């Protein structure tokens, strides 16, 4: 499909009363911000941003430039401007966080909700379906392939654990941390299981037992497990659902577990396969002293542009000119550092 078809779908969710309450109170799409606060920045509204990358990025020769000050970003802002003016995008997207957006999407009260939602792949597909089912909302979700105008959904760089060098010239402390934490984190056995699934007997078990989720409600479900069968137990913070994971997502482990414990559902696996097929790697994140010093100020200037163009319907060229005047010296210093090598 292409942009025009996608936008027509959003307008249908906006204008054709999908919640059936006779009121004009639904939207085509919503997101946690018109631009993300962290890389890859565009992932919650990918069809609008398409191949624009509104941060420091690099060309095919490896030369860094400011991706916000580009025609691609201007075009994306104009698409967002039109959607805001048409009432297609939830205006609360300007200030909502991810928790706000997903809870509005699966809420039992669908007035004020929206149709299209871009979120994380993998086990989050299960979370969305489970929460919609729990709230009595139709969970027949359809995954959308990328529109023709974009290369694919962005596969962001993974968050990482780091050991900070204390600068004393002696690596023994850092090596000890690596040996105690990282080596055991991926030992394929007991400690990795703790990182992935949590504590035995509390988050998971291999003992015979009966587990009931949503006990006493119309969503009550019973699970029977035999002795020796690995299974997850009740979520300590939500007795209507089973526990899913600890710090490491079991569907994206870089080292397999020797005990063969497996919890990823078919839905999670299908979602991961779909994403792998339809995604491209996001650009590497930029890092230098200038970004540390000026990143917040530059992001504030970007948000001024977005508010002026998207929310107020202002002129995109004038807003971008103001961005350049505000940030030029900082951007030049950052690009000088990034391209120094």
Name every feature range the model reports, one short phrase each.
Residues 1-341:
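Extracytoplasmic/secretory soluble proteins
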């Amino acid at each position: 499909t292409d942009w025009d078809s996608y936008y027509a779908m959003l307008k249908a969710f906006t204008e054709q009363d999908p919640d059936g309450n006779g009121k004009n109170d639904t939207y085509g799409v919503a997101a946690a911000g018109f631009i993300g606060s962290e890389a890859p920045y565009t992932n919650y509204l990918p069809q609008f941003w398409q191949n624009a990358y509104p941060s420091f990025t690099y060309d095919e020769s490896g030369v860094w430039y400011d991706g916000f000050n580009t025609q691609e970003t201007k075009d994306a802002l104009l698409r967002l401007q039109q959607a805001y003016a048409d009432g297609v995008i939830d205006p609360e997207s300007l200030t909502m966080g991810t928790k706000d957006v997903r809870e509005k999407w699966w809420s039992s009260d669908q007035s004020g909700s929206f149709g299209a939602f871009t979120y994380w792949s993998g086990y989050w597909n299960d979370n969305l379906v489970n929460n919609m089912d729990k709230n009595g909302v139709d969970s027949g979700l359809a995954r959308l392939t990328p529109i023709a105008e974009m290369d694919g959904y962005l596969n962001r760089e993974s968050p990482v654990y780091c050991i900070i060098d204390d600068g004393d010239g002696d690596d023994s402390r850092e090596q000890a941390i690596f040996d105690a934490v990282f080596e055991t984190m991926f030992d394929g056995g007991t400690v990795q299981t703790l990182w992935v699934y949590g504590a035995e007997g509390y988050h998971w078990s291999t003992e015979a037992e009966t587990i009931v989720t949503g006990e006493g409600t119309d969503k009550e479900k019973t699970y029977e497990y035999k002795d020796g069968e690995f299974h997850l137990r009740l979520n300590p913070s939500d007795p209507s659902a089973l526990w899913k994971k600890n710090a490491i997502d079991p569907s994206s482990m870089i080292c397999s577990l020797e005990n063969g414990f497996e919890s990823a559902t078919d839905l999670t696996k299908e979602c991961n396969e779909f994403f792998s097929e339809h995604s491209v790697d996001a650009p590497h994140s930029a890092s230098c002293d200038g970004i540390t010093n000026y990143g917040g100020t530059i992001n504030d200037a970007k948000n001024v542009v977005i508010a002026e163009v998207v929310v107020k319907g202002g002129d995109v060229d004038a807003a971008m000119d103001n961005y350049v005047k505000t940030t030029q010296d900082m951007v030049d210093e950052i690009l000088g550092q990034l391209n120094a090598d």
